[in-house]
Amino acid sequence: MGNQDKMSTPGRWMSLDIGTKRVGIALSDPLGITARPFSVIPRRPRLFDHIQALVQEYDVRGIVVGIPRRTGGEETELCDQVRQLASELEKRLGIKVRTYDERYSTKEAERMMSERGIPVRERRARRDAFAAAVILQWFLEEHDR
């Protein structure tokens, strides 16, 4: 599960920004070129079922999971949990699951929401989905089309 893999065929990708309480979800367009925020869901026991349903409904070919590192690149307490979840997703769903450094994604998500005129009071509820979209867009831009 590295982020150096090359992607040779187009398809829709999903991104997950996994926190301790919530999971932000983003989806790409069907060609895997642009990312958009999709939803924020609680991190709960049936998380796998919810993700599997979305993968099937939107014909997702791969998932990008953000790895929460500190600004200096050090691992956070959540990194191991996120890697385990990514590994389990790959086993259960039978599709590619890649990890990607999510540093600065929340800051970029805040900037995007501000530029789009999203009221401050609404931003907290949407932040994780926007951060997932940032992670996914970075991933898509870094890989060959």
Q: Where are each of the predicted segments found?
A:
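Phosphate- and other anionic-substrate recognition elements at nucleic-acid/protein interfaces
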Residues: 2-16, 20-145
